[in-house]
Amino acid sequence: IKLSQGAKPGHGGMLMAPKVTPEIAEARGVPAYQDVISPSRHSEFSTPNELLTFASKLRDLAGGKPVGIKLCIGHPWEIISIVRAMVDSGVMLDFITVDGSEGGTGAAPVEFTDNIGSPLRDALIFVDNCLRGAGLRDRVKIAASAKIVSAYDIVRHCALAEDAFAADSLR
């Protein structure tokens, strides 16, 4: 469940017209080769507890497959409130993908790229500390997503906190 992205926190998704092939257009129910703008908020939830209810529903619909969130840490209270809701409700996310502020999308406003949100290193440590402090670190996996371009980046982020990573290409 994508909550935010490092290159454009608070902005919805934008799929540029050249990428909206007939196959993608059919799957999304939109015209081919026209920009597709997705809203920045989910209609299914607006609070951490509603997020967890939605995640649980998705997990059930997917036959028990793992469900998690992707976010760029902007306001620390956002992840703190999600972790608190997991503690209070007992409903867990299976993973949290932490996206660093190091932008990696052509759809981001230039002034946002690399400048908004927490850098991946700091964000990984923060999310790991939140989960450890709540006693949930062994139940919730952490994935990293940002400019991970080398084997060194992978080793460094694994040493910091991550259990998995997402990278477009490695050198």
Model regions and ranges:
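Flexible glycine-/small-residue-enriched beta->alpha junction loops
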Residues: 1-34
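Short glycine/proline- and acidic residue-enriched helix-loop micro-motifs
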Residues: 33-41
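Glycine-rich phosphate/ribose-binding loops and adjacent secondary-structure elements
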Residues: 43-171
